[in-house]
């Protein structure tokens, strides 16, 4: 792409796929993404020896949503713990689904195709933002949870683009003109 600035200087802008893009979870993120996959490392570091149920239960206890006794008494499964987290006033929570077929793509849109495909997709983890995390990074808001959900969706989408190889880099070079020269500037002929 050839560009010209206000002073007539010409530039060449080259945009190309970045095959060595950095994992976006190494950036400054607001949400926490935890996944359990055998073939991929997706999201933030966490103890993979814990099951998804253990991680959800810990999150419920740490955020005063449920006690260990309540969880054992009600014999709650992952989906019930996720529902308790979604209904909480102090945490924004989203499931993460993956579709794996000649590559992988992830989304928080769990109920839509292809993320609800019965053979090649399934829940691989979850993302969350606590009210405390949100207020620390974004300030106090009455609609903090709605905004935190948007942040989760956006950060998961960014990770998905990285997984799918949709990362680009650019190089901006000043165009060099050789005027009125009788010799080649490279070989001097």
Feature roles, as predicted:
Residues 1-189:
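Acidic interaction surfaces
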């Amino acid at each position: 792409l050839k560009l010209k600035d206000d002073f007539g200087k010409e530039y060449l802008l080259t945009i190309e796929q970045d095959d060595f893009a950095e994992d976006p979870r190494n950036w400054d993120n607001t949400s926490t993404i935890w996944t359990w996959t055998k073939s991929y490392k997706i999201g933030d570091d966490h103890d993979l020896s814990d099951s998804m149920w253990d991680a959800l239960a810990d999150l419920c206890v740490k955020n005063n949503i449920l006690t260990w006794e309540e969880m054992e008494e009600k014999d709650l499964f992952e989906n019930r713990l996720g529902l308790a987290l979604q209904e909480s006033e102090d945490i924004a929570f989203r499931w993460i689904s993956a579709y794996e077929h000649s590559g992988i793509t992830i989304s928080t849109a769990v109920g839509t195709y292809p993320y609800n495909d019965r053979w090649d997709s399934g829940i691989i983890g979850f993302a969350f933002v606590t009210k405390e995390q949100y207020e620390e990074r974004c300030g106090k808001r009455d609609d903090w949870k709605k905004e935190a959900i948007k942040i989760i969706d956006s950060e998961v989408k960014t990770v998905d683009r990285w997984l799918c190889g949709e990362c680009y880099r650019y190089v901006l070079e000043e165009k060099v003109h050789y005027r009125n020269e009788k010799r080649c500037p490279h070989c001097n002929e």
